From Swiss-Prot:
Catalysed reactions listed for this entry: L-glutaminyl-[peptide chain release factor] + S-adenosyl-L-methionine = N(5)-methyl-L-glutaminyl-[peptide chain release factor] + S-adenosyl-L-homocysteine + H(+)
Annotated residues for binding of S-adenosyl-L-methionine: 112-116, 135, 162, 178
Pfam assignment, any one: PrmC_N
Entry binding sites for substrate: 178-181
Family: Belongs to the protein N5-glutamine methyltransferase family. PrmC subfamily.
UniProt xrefs under SUPFAM superfamilies: S-adenosyl-L-methionine-dependent methyltransferases (SSF53335)
Protein name: Release factor glutamine methyltransferase
HAMAP family associated with the record: RF_methyltr_PrmC
Any one of the GO BP annotations: methylation
Entry function: Methylates the class 1 translation termination release factors RF1/PrfA and RF2/PrfB on the glutamine residue of the universally conserved GGQ motif.
One Gene Ontology MF term: protein-glutamine N-methyltransferase activity
EC numbers for this chain: 2.1.1.297
The species this protein was found in: Bordetella pertussis (strain Tohama I / ATCC BAA-589 / NCTC 13251)
Amino acid sequence: MTLLKDLLADPGLPRLEARMLAEHVLGRSRAWLLAHDTDPVEPAHEAAWRQLAARRLAGEPMAYLLGGREFMGHWYALTPDVLIPRPDTELLVETALHWLQGRAAPRVLDLGTGSGAIAVSVALGCPQAEVTATDLSAAALAVAEGNAQRLGARVRCLAGDWYEALPAQDRYDLIVSNPPYIAREDAHLAQGDLRFEPRGALTDENDGLAALARIAGGAPGRLLPGGAIWMEHGWDQAEAARALLRQAGLREVHSRRDLAGIERISGGYL
C-alpha cells in the first residue's frame, strides 16, 4: 500500500492542497498526518484522495472539494449551488456590524444570500438582530438554512427574486447584498474558480449593474426611516453604484475601501 508521505508528495498538487485533501478524506488533523506519515493508506482512502486530486487538477475549487470554507471565523458548508465566500466580502459584514452597534432589535435583510455567509455572520455578530435572507435558488437557500442551523444563527430564509421574496409589509433597518455584478461578456467568467461557480451568482447576464440597480432602486420602499443599505460591487463599479444609490433618493452616499485599497462596497441612508 502507498505510504501517507508518498501520497502527500504527489508531484501534481501543491503540498498544502494535497495535505488538505488528505485531512478531508481521512478525517484527521494536520498534526495527525505529520505523526503518521509513514502509515500505509487504505486503498479506499487513496482512491478517494486521487479522485479529489484529479478534480482539483482540472481546476475545481478547493472549497467545493472540501465541502466548505471559513468566513469571518466560522466554517460554512458549500456546494456548487452557491458562490464561494471571499475575504473581500468580510468588509460588508464588518460595516454592517459596526452600523448595528447599540441598536436594540434591528431588522436586517440580506438579498441574494447564497451560502448564507453574510446573513449568518451578521446574526452571530449581532444576536439581537432579526435577520432575513432571500435567494431565488431553492438549492442555495437549503445551504444557507443548513449553515444557520449548524452555527446557531437566527436567520429567516425566503425564496424569491430580490424584494419579491418579502411580505409586502416588511421594512428593515439595514439592507446588505453581494449580488451578481460581473458583466455577461467578461472573460473572467471562463477562468479559474468562476468556471465552477453558479453563473447566476456571478453575472446579471447584462452589463454587471442590473442587479445593483434593482437593489438600490427598491431600497427606499423597504427601509425604515434612517435605515441604511450597503452593496458589494466590482473594483471599477463604485462610481456607478453611488450614482444608482443617489438616483434612488438615498443620502450620504459613499464607498468604503478594502484592505487592498479598492472601493469594494457602496451605501447610503434613507
